[in-house]
Amino acid sequence: MDDLEAVLSRVRDRAVPEPAERDRLRTVAVELADRTREAIADLPVDADVVQVGSTARDTWVSGDRDIDLFVRFDAALDREQLEEYGLAVGHAVLPDGHEEYAEHPYVKGTYEGFDVDLVPCHDVETAGDLISAVDRTPFHDAYLSARLDEGLADDVVLAKAFLKGIGAYGSDLRTEGFSGYLTELLVLELGGFVPLVESARSWHPPVEFDPEGHAERTFDDPLVVVDPTDPTRNVAAVLSAENLARFQHYARELLAAPSEAPFEPVDPAPLDPTDVRDHLDRRETTPVAVVFDAPDLVDDQLWPQLRRSLDGIVRGLNDRGFDVLRARAMTDGSGPEADGDGAKRAALYAELEVAERPAVTRHEGPPVAVRKHAASFYESYADDVDPETYGPFIDGDRYVVEREREFTTVREYLESDAAGDVALGAQVEREFAERDVLVGDAVATLAPAFGVPLREFYEPHP
């Protein structure tokens, strides 16, 4: 078995950027900052530019090519002008860039092979004075830059490489993982990468860290790291319980059997239709997929709606006796036919233990001894002339009826209006009306577009 320090030394050698890589990034960042200042000079208001993020703090993993520049405008500038001037600067610096939207629009593009975000914000005095969420980012950068020495910075790189390798890195709402800022705060708080994983293996959520001891509220999240620049904010709010558990699992594995494997992301190969059918034959369950056009939304808006919709469909299936073994939302954005412009189709995919139910279902009333409620139940069915209803009769101590089941097959339910009555995301609901329903072997036809998430579904691991 490899010694842990030997493993980390090898990972550090390839994950920490070489001087030439750092110098190249710094040169490009300086060029971009100069271009930004030139664009600012053409505005009728004052502003400055600051580089933020991991590439500003030498805490990025080798190969990352992200440069984040924030243009800080006077706090008195209204939101409309901030957006107007911010976009003007962004398009001047990145003429081939495009607009994206966080709390307000910004420009994203490429320059000399680097991915660049040029974000306008307000130049507020403290993070507590923020006008929009992005205003706090320069304070994050200043806090960490003042505290991370070279050794801790290298340990941050190890932590990020580890989290990327296990699939738990990224605060986007698709991943729900560890943000870069959260990762750096944890390394700083625990004193290094090894102390972090040694601590994490024994965590019993909820776990809370408050670096500045200034929390002004309580939080309900499984991991709480109070923002040292904002006592009302949990930096780990986006982190899912699943990704926290995943981190703990691999922390234990790394310490028990040191290996470079957790630091090496593996892109799963897509399943083909034959692979899917092989899994179906072996599992003898009934898969179903509700497939529809993905709403034209950025991932941070799309994925919460897909998860909400999946939860609604799963509840609907379970409530009608089609017992769901496992389910997940999928998009074709990572499939081999994806064109890089985001998801075009989405699927709510579930594996069922039961796909067909009897024509009747049992409905229990209250115990006969509960006079008022029992009488109401009895009378409501005693006068029912529906020939498909059996009873009411007494079974044990209560009234029971057996009545016609609304849906006997899962296809009937998923193709009915009732399937759309569950809690769906607002934009998903519109597309859901034009859904396709696949049952059984028919789901294998999804493989060309959904092969990667299908492999993740049928070959799960921590």
Curated annotation (Swiss-Prot):
Biological processes per GO annotation: RNA repair; tRNA 3'-terminal CCA addition
Entry's Gene Ontology molecular function annotations: ATP binding; CCA tRNA nucleotidyltransferase activity; magnesium ion binding; tRNA binding
Keywords on record: ATP-binding, Magnesium, Metal-binding, Nucleotide-binding, Nucleotidyltransferase, RNA repair, RNA-binding, Transferase, tRNA processing
Transmembrane segments: none
One Pfam family linked to the record: NTP_transf_2
Chain positions recorded as ATP binding sites: S54, R57, H140, K160, Y169
Leader peptide range in chain numbering: none
Reaction it catalyzes: a tRNA precursor + 2 CTP + ATP = a tRNA with a 3' CCA end + 3 diphosphate; a tRNA with a 3' CCA end + 2 CTP + ATP = a tRNA with a 3' CCACCA end + 3 diphosphate
Key word Protease present: no
EC number: 2.7.7.72
InterPro entries per UniProt: CAA_C, CCA-adding_arc, CCA_tRNA_nucleotrans_2, NT_2-5OAS_ClassI-CCAase, NT_sf, NuclTrfase_I-like_C, Polymerase_NTP_transf_dom, tRNA_NucTransf2
Top EC class for this record: transferase
Cofactor: Mg(2+)
Binding site for CTP: S54, R57, H140, K160, Y169
Binding site for Mg(2+): D66, D68, D117
Other comments on record: A single active site specifically recognizes both ATP and CTP and is responsible for their addition.
Its job: Catalyzes the addition and repair of the essential 3'-terminal CCA sequence in tRNAs without using a nucleic acid template. Adds these three nucleotides in the order of C, C, and A to the tRNA nucleotide-73, using CTP and ATP as substrates and producing inorganic pyrophosphate. tRNA 3'-terminal CCA addition is required both for tRNA processing and repair. Also involved in tRNA surveillance by mediating tandem CCA addition to generate a CCACCA at the 3' terminus of unstable tRNAs. While stable tRNAs receive only 3'-terminal CCA, unstable tRNAs are marked with CCACCA and rapidly degraded.
Subunit structure: Homodimer.
Entries under NCBIfam families matching the protein: cca_archaeal (TIGR03671)
Protein name: CCA-adding enzyme
Organism: Halorubrum lacusprofundi (strain ATCC 49239 / DSM 5036 / JCM 8891 / ACAM 34)
Gene label: cca
